[in-house]
Regions:
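Short acidic-glycine-tyrosine-enriched beta hairpin
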Residues: 111, 125-161, 199
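Long hydrophobic alpha-helical segments typical of transmembrane helices together
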Residues: 187-211
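Short beta-strand His + acidic residue motifs that chelate non-heme Fe in jelly-roll/DSBH
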Residues: 100-103, 121-122, 154, 160-165, ...
Length: 211
């Protein structure tokens, strides 16, 4: 009984990110199938995106600024056992009207959840047989305006980009592995060109204020 009471007390004192981590670790322990695992993670992320404390705290998160050819992500958490990472991505005034490079996330799974603001998510199909190096033919397959609470699952090697629409946008991104230490695919459709480069720089940040 004492153990149960202690567990209940600990659960009640959790903040939104701690609760997300606990539920995600439990899911990863129970579900080995990656597609099922990442689809089952959607409602857990939706709960995090709806948390008033997270929404309020995000107003103070620093803007992510590309530098030296690399994007920037805020790094809130990296799991020591399962390897998943919780990132933030804030796009302020400096990023308005810009399209992120068309890219894939290489071998990892990613859940992209919009926390605040609106932006367009554009996806592409790959048309060539991948036999030629530095070459790719892609075609736009969807163009969707997304807003707070909407979640996009990006599976390995799926091609996409995000486009700002004139307002500050904030996303919480869950990755199966922290980005930045491996190359990701980049696509230049006007030239049918493909190349690879490192993913986003990781800037450590607190999701929620301490105390």
């Amino acid at each position: 009984m004492e153990t149960q009471t202690a567990t209940q007390s600990q659960t009640q004192s959790e903040n939104a990110m701690q609760r997300f981590v606990r539920k995600t670790r439990a899911l990863f322990a129970q579900e080995p199938d990656l597609d099922k695992r990442w689809n089952s993670l959607r409602p857990i992320l939706a709960e995090l995106l709806a948390d008033p404390e997270v929404i309020a705290a995000s107003k103070q998160w620093p803007d992510c600024v590309p530098a030296n050819g690399r994007a920037e992500n805020l790094l809130f958490y990296e799991d020591p056992d399962y390897g998943f990472a919780i990132n933030g991505l804030t796009k302020g005034e400096a990023r308005q009207g810009q399209r992120a490079r068309i890219h894939d996330h290489a071998h990892i799974y990613t859940l992209y959840g919009v926390l605040d603001g609106h932006e367009k998510v554009v996806r592409y199909d790959r048309l060539d047989d991948r036999s030629k190096p530095d070459y790719a033919e892609i075609r736009e397959s969807s163009d969707v305006l997304v807003g707070p609470g909407e979640i996009d699952l990006v599976k390995p090697y799926e091609i996409h980009t995000e486009i700002t629409v004139g307002e500050r946008t904030v996303a919480v991104i869950i990755r199966s592995q922290k980005g930045g230490d491996f190359n990701q695919g980049r696509y230049v459709p006007e030239e049918n060109r493909y190349y690879e480069s490192l993913g986003p720089r990781q800037t450590h940040c607190e999701m929620l204020p301490k105390g």
